[in-house]
């Protein structure tokens, strides 16, 4: 019995092929998680031979690390843009908490959770995780420092408070992956805790209405 013959892949420039492979890895990760980004899976997604993917991406661990970085950096840029135009640090912080804890970002949360676990054995991925955690902490710290400067927030250490807040967000979102608690509870629990951390009145960080 003859085996099916794969149709020869259309010729593309190196830049086009590299972008196609990166896009396929990105889609696989968001749909099925980082562990799904394998040589064979990427090749199947773009209908080429695994050898062609290996030619452009000889180190799949590097591809996994870059895929993680691109996904989480895009989310950071999106959240930063969402809150940047709001008039006060308090409103920016409230909007940040609302969008990060409303349950709409579970696909990216899965990426984070898998990256923390896989990064124990994959140093390139671990380095990327550390870089992106630093980037998130820096963004949150900037909002807190602006609030301290304007007199809205009270904290002697905005950097430490930013790490605490990031840990709360990450932990609650990770728990949500196994359907523990609902989005409303996660948001209110975090908001009330952060209000206490920053010397705010209860309800000061209630979710805003963004028009």
Q: Language-model segments: which ranges?
A:
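Short, basic, alpha-helical segments at the C-terminal edge of helix-turn-helix-like DNA-binding modules
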Residues: 69-74
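Solvent-exposed, amphipathic alpha-helical segments
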Residues: 20, 24-32, 78-82, 111, ...
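Short coil/turn segments at alpha/beta junctions that flank glycine-rich nucleotide-binding fingerprints
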Residues: 31-35, 85, 150
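Hydrophobic/aromatic-rich alpha-helical bundle segments in the mid-to-C-terminal region
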Residues: 124-130, 134, 148-211
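Helix-turn-helix
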Residues: 20, 24-62, 66
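N-terminal intrinsically disordered/low-complexity leader segments
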Residues: 1-16, 205-211
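Hydrophobic alpha-helical connector segments
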Residues: 66, 77-109, 161-165, 187, ...
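Amphipathic alpha-helical segments used for helix-helix packing
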Residues: 92, 105-126
């Amino acid at each position: 019995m003859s085996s099916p013959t794969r149709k020869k892949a259309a010729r593309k420039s190196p830049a086009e092929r590299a972008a196609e492979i990166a896009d396929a890895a990105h889609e696989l990760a968001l749909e099925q998680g980082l562990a799904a980004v394998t040589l064979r899976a990427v090749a199947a997604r773009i209908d080429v031979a695994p050898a062609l993917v290996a030619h452009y991406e000889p180190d799949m661990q590097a591809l996994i690390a870059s895929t993680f970085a691109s996904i989480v950096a895009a989310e950071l840029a999106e959240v930063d843009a969402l809150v940047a135009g709001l008039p006060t640090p308090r409103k920016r912080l409230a909007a940040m908490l609302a969008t990060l804890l409303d349950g709409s970002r579970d696909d990216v949360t899965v990426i984070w959770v898998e990256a923390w676990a896989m990064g124990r054995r994959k140093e390139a991925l671990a380095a990327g995780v550390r870089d992106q955690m630093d980037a998130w902490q820096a963004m949150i710290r900037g909002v807190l420092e602006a609030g301290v400067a304007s007199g809205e927030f009270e904290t002697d250490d905005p950097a430490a408070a930013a790490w605490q807040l990031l840990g709360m967000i990450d932990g609650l979102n990770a728990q949500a992956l196994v359907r523990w608690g609902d989005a409303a509870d996660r948001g209110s629990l975090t908001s009330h805790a952060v209000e206490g951390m920053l010397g705010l009145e209860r309800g000061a960080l209630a979710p805003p209405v963004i028009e």
